[in-house]
């Protein structure tokens, strides 16, 4: 059994058979929709029709094919301490071909064989129909040669293995979709202007000798997603995402490495924060790192804790979100924490959860997990996962599970990987709220009630991960970066370092006492079996009766022996005035 962690960081079927002439109308367009020409999509659909006729008559027959393509431009530039490190701009076209052999009831993706259905490759950058068709033809040939023997193996394994508990089909039949917006947006930024800006912004770290490494990275990517299938879907949708990532690192005297990361994401470069905002963020990052170097190492602890909204959002992404992904309810290697709890209370009744990829912004922030169509060509949809503490649904791709036979628009994947049910915009709401400013006093009251000398306040996090497979502990780990001891006797709050939140889901969820009244958003990149996809999680701050923390593993490499260039002779003066731990 392979161990697999899901992590979060700050940073589709033919109705009957392919031989049916009605699967694709003669002109290649979905019925009852106006045909919108697009050279790449048109070539994909023409070659798909040709392949479907042949492969539907093969032995064993292919009953479903789909082509997807990602066509766009990407620009990445980075700078450190006032100088450019890199600047790359390029065009790309990637294709994914899915070939399903057998029938919707049983096909080559059954069990642990999902990856056999997809092959990936590059496409010509120019709209030459012959060159594009040739590439798609070769990928389709590879796809069938992978899928056909996999299906024969599935049939053999099914015959000799014990009966499965979930006897759902392997693929959900869905109506065809049509939406063609063939624009591929321009990158839309002035390269020279942004190179100069990154030089200026990265130079601000020069004044902080205890920041040992820092970098600012700008990523601007535009793409046009195209999708067509033998069921008649025809989709083209543009996308534009810009990310500005600021990273800074230092090391304590005991060798512990501390990293601060700030990530800003937007649909356009103009929507990124101003230089003044970035300057303030860098000053705070440097101050945080300086304070963390001097902060004491936290000890293992179990007691009351307050999670900021961002920390609570990551907590729910890891603890709940991954465990509500549909395929995990069917995979017998998974822990299936919530599989048989539909209709049961799984968390306090004042909490509800939806996943809504149709929402583009929340609480004044753009959401990274937004999309119109998922990677299986299904329209995005709002899904009520938990209502008043009661589990209602799962995040579904086109892989059915017991009790949930259709997709709800959450089939997502990194290009070239097989889709699974994934999170988009996970939103946690509460009906048991107090003003956010009151939560600290509530934390102190809870610590006094339990006879604890302090509670913990988790101000910011950098991400987390979770283990979901049986045979492994059904545990999660959230990685905080700014953590405070909030003393119950009135002493100032004390900054600590080297601490991770750990626990198991069912126990942790039922220790939430009350929440704040303000929503906070965490945008990040989530990695799992179907690759890395952009996601958002939103939640209010939350007070827990008990959170368990453990010491974080760290290296024992010493800080640099030499002072930073330009700071020779200043180390004594700097040492005399440096903070002996953070307090507030």
What are these regions (language model features)?
Residues 5, 23-373, 378, 387-390, ...:
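Active-site bordering "gate/hinge" segments
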Residues 392-446:
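C-terminal, non-catalytic macromolecule-binding modules
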Residues 379-381, 481-482:
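Short loop/turn microsegments at loop-to-beta-strand junctions
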């Amino acid at each position: 059994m392979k161990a697999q962690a899901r992590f979060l960081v700050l940073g589709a079927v033919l109705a009957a058979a392919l031989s049916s002439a009605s699967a694709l109308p003669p002109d290649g367009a979905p019925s009852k929709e106006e045909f919108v020409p697009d050279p790449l999509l048109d070539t994909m659909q023409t070659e798909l029709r040709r392949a479907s006729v042949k492969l539907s008559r093969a032995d064993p027959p292919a009953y479903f094919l789909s082509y997807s393509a990602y066509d766009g431009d990407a620009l990445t530039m980075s700078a450190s301490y006032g100088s450019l490190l890199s600047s790359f701009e390029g065009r790309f076209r990637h294709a994914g071909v899915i070939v399903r052999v057998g029938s919707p009831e049983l096909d080559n993706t059954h069990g642990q064989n999902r990856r056999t259905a997809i092959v990936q490759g590059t496409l010509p950058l120019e709209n030459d129909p012959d060159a594009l068709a040739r590439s798609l033809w070769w990928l389709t040939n590879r796809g069938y040669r992978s899928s056909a023997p996999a299906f024969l193996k599935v049939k053999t394994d099914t015959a000799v293995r014990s009966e499965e508990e979930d006897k759902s089909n392997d693929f959900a039949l869905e109506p065809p979709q049509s939406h063609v917006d063939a624009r591929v947006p321009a990158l839309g930024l002035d390269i020279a202007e942004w190179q100069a800006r990154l030089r200026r912004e990265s130079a601000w770290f020069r004044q902080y000798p205890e920041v040992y490494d820092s970098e600012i990275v700008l990523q601007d990517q535009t793409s046009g997603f195209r999708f067509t299938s033998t069921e008649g879907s025809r989709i083209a949708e543009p996308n534009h995402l810009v990310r500005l990532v600021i990273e800074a690192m230092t090391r304590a005297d005991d060798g512990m490495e501390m990293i601060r990361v700030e990530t800003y994401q937007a649909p356009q470069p103009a929507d990124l924060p101003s230089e003044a905002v970035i300057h303030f963020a860098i000053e705070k990052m440097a101050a945080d790192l300086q304070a963390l170097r001097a902060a004491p190492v936290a000890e293992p602890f179990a007691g009351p804790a307050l999670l900021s909204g961002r920390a609570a959002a990551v907590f729910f992404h890891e603890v709940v979100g991954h465990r509500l992904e549909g395929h995990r309810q069917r995979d017998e290697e998974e822990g299936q924490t919530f599989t048989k709890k539909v209709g049961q209370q799984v968390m306090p009744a004042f909490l509800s959860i939806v996943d809504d990829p149709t929402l583009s912004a929340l609480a004044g922030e753009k959401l990274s997990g937004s999309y119109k169509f998922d990677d299986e060509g299904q329209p995005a949809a709002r899904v009520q996962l938990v209502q008043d503490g009661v589990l209602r649904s799962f995040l579904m791709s086109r892989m059915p599970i017991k009790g949930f036979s259709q997709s709800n628009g959450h089939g997502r994947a990194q290009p070239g990987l097989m889709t699974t049910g994934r999170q988009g915009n996970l939103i946690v709401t509460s009906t048991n709220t107090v003003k956010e400013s009151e939560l600290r006093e509530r934390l102190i009251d809870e610590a006094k009630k339990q006879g604890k000398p302090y509670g913990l306040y988790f101000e910011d996090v950098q991400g987390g991960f979770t283990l979901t497979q049986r045979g492994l502990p059904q545990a999660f780990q959230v990685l905080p970066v700014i953590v405070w001891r909030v003393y119950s006797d009135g002493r100032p709050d004390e900054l600590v370092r080297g601490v991770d939140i750990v626990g198991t889901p069912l126990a942790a969820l039922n220790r939430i006492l009350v929440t704040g009244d303000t929503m906070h958003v965490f945008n990040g990149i989530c990695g799992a079996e179907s690759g890395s996809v952009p996601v958002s999680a939103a939640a209010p701050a939350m007070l827990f009766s008990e959170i368990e923390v453990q010491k974080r593993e760290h290296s024992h490499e010493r800080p640099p022996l030499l002072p930073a260039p330009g700071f020779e002779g200043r180390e004594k003066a700097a040492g005399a005035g440096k903070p002996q731990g953070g307090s507030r």
